[in-house]
Design a protein with these regions (language model features):
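N-terminal "domain-start" segment that seeds a small globular fold
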Residues: 9-38
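Short active-site neighborhood of thiol/selenol oxidoreductases, capturing the structured segment around
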Residues: 37-65
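Short, internal strand/loop/helix patches
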Residues: 94-138
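Short hydrophobic alpha-helix segments
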Residues: 38, 115, 152-154
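Transmembrane alpha-helices
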Residues: 1-9
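Short loop/turn microsegments at loop-to-beta-strand junctions
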Residues: 22-23, 44, 138-140
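Structural microenvironment flanking redox-active thiols in thiol-disulfide oxidoreductases
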Residues: 60-112
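Thiol-/selenol-based redox modules, centered on thioredoxin-like
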Residues: 128-182
Length: 182
C-alpha cells in the first residue's frame, strides 16, 4: 500500500536524457526578472524542480541541500530551485533559507511542460485555497555541466524518495565538474 500510494507512475522524460542538452526555458528570479535557463551555462548547475513550500518532502530535500551549501559553493556549482508556486512563496523560501541559491518561479508551469515533468492537476485537493495553482511539477533533479549538457537526472517515481545531497556531490566529483569558486 505505502509504495502504491506514493507512486507517480511516471515515465522518464525524453527531454532529460543524460548526454542531451537541457532544453531552454524561462523562469522568474526572486526579483521578478525573466531568466533563461541558458544563462546558467557558465558553470555546472544542480537544478531542483520542487512542488512548492506546501510539500514537506520537497522542503526536507531543499533544507538538506541548503545544509551543504558551503561544500557546493566551494565546488563552484550553482543551485537552481524551481517551483510553479506563487512568486510570493518563492520569495518567502529564499528569505527563510538565506543561502546563495537561485530561487526561481516557473510561471504557468512552462518550464515543467518543456521538460516533460508536469502532471496536470497534480496538486492535492484543497491547496488551491492557499494560493497554489492546480498544476505542479514532478520532483526532479538534473545536474548540467558547464555549457548545459545533462550529466545526471533523477526523476523519482515515489514522492517520498529523494536523493541525498551527497549523491549530487559525488556526481559532480565523478564527472569532474568541480570548478573552484572565485
Amino acid at each position: 500500500y505505502a509504495y502504491w500510494y506514493s507512486s507517480f507512475n511516471r515515465q522518464p522524460s525524453p527531454q532529460l536524457e543524460v548526454g542531451s542538452m537541457l532544453p531552454g526555458f524561462e523562469v522568474l528570479d526572486i526579483a521578478g526578472r525573466t531568466v533563461n535557463s541558458g544563462s546558467f551555462n557558465d558553470r555546472p548547475t544542480i537544478w531542483i524542480f520542487h512542488r512548492g513550500n506546501w510539500c514537506p518532502l520537497c522542503m526536507a530535500q531543499i533544507k538538506e541541500v541548503a545544509s551543504q551549501y558551503r561544500d557546493i559553493q566551494a565546488m563552484g556549482v550553482r543551485v537552481a530551485l524551481v517551483s510553479p508556486q506563487s512568486h510570493k512563496y518563492t520569495i518567502d523560501l529564499a528569505q527563510r533559507l538565506d543561502v546563495p541559491f537561485e530561487f526561481m518561479t516557473d510561471v504557468c508551469n512552462r518550464a515543467a511542460k518543456t521538460l516533460g515533468i508536469d502532471p496536470p492537476c497534480g496538486l492535492p485537493m484543497g491547496m488551491q485555497v492557499l494560493g497554489y495553482d492546480s498544476d505542479t511539477v514532478l520532483p526532479t533533479v538534473v545536474i548540467t555541466e558547464q555549457g548545459g549538457r545533462i550529466v545526471w537526472a533523477h526523476e523519482t517515481d515515489n514522492y517520498r524518495v529523494r536523493p541525498e545531497p551527497e549523491i549530487y556531490l559525488d556526481v559532480l566529483r565523478d564527472k569532474g565538474l568541480i570548478v573552484p569558486a572565485t
